[in-house]
Amino acid sequence: MMERWLWHSRRLRREGPGWPELMEYGLLALALAIPASAAPAQVAAQTLAVTGATVIDPLADAPLTNGVVVMEDGRITAVGAADAVDVPAGTEIIDARGKYVIPGLMDANLHLYLNLDLETLIKYEGRYHEIVLEAAQLTLKTGQTTVFDTWGPLGALAKARDMIDAGEAPGSRIYFAGNIIGFDGPLSTDFRGEAAAHVSKSFVRRTNEAWEHGTGRDLMWMTPDSVRTAIRRYTDTGVDFLKYGSSSHVEMFFISFSERVQRVIVEEGHRAGMTVQTHTTSVESLDMAIEAGVDIITHGDISGPVVPIPMETVRKLVERDIAVSVLPITQRRLDALQKHNPDGTLTPYMAVAHENQARMIEAGVSMLLSTDAGIKHPVLLAESGTIASDTVDQRVKLGEGHFNAMAALEELGMAPMEILRSMTSHIARAYEMEEEIGSLRPGMIADLVILDANPLEAARNYRAIHAVIKDGRRVDIDALPVAPIISVLKPDN
């Protein structure tokens, strides 16, 4: 709890109204919330060292051969050549000769609860946090030590996040936005509105409220000042960052909020010390978000089914240092979509996105690897009418999509070290966490992945995971997920 609060307080370094009051309130609240009897118990420091590996730090000039990484009490304490680093006596050693060490991977945009079918919503009501935990364990198993959930049920995400932070369950470190501001919940016309006719109005209301928390479509009727009040309330709900819709979801050609309101949302997020990102699906919604001052454009490579992003706008992203989470897919997947699902809503969008991604690479945009992924229920996948394309280099399958996205960036010509940065240091910097995660330097949180093959030689080598270390402790990846609910076939699902 203390570590997460300190992270938020560091991010309140933004110069702006409310800083002294926020700090005074925050310190007082923390003092009242943690009595002396509740202080965390002292535990013996655990020291771990990885030796003999090629250490690939995304911020270093070159890989370090025969390197050593020393970790103590969850933090990196030393990184260097074997003959230059003293390993303390009694340290647990992982011999990584012939292997490669990289920072823990991340996904800038995923959904740990993405299961909007009525069967799952009904059957697991009150237990959504268990599915979030299952998802966070699938991501950790595949090297993602930190993930950023950009749309989901606030209460379930908060419960799972806090359980992982407290050591009550294994899983990737979670940061989340809760609702996409301006969107109604899953059983609405923004998502699966047609399903609402098959359940009670009470269930529809409960389900939608689990996502919305006062930030649904009603905001679009409000004045900027009224929206400001609503956003200020929402920043107190426990979310880690804000995401709003600059364009709509199902009807992707519509602009959601006016320029004035978008600026208000960004201002209030920054006032609370949070980064702010936006959902965009068109050239104009992208440009409006840039002008509003967002930190991250979510799937900003999606600009509609026809028009690519003008280079003028791409250059603006670089000039204003705005990061873009992208949804790259392999050429093989794009071919499968065009062959087996040519009438699919996203098929033409992904073709244009391919061109946008190439333009962003050329211009030097800070690109963040993302997948929009969630747990893919095996029964629903098997019954899919588009299974012929759904199963080719999947994008939205947790634990698989990020590997395919890396291969797609490689196909597009992104440099090998830049691919690594797109999953590590670029994401950390975009979320203003570069002092904690994303690189291998003393003082950083000790999140590492050990690979059996060199990722700089081929993107497929990211799959060759030998070990995952999170918070300075080796993860039992073979045991994950510990209690699968919907990711595997069982008699009751």
Which residues does each PLM region occupy?
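Divalent metal-dependent hydrolysis catalytic cores, especially in the metallo-beta-lactamase
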Residues: 132-156, 171-180, 238-250, 275, ...
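His/Asp/Glu-enriched, well-ordered alpha-helical/loop segment
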Residues: 271, 354-454
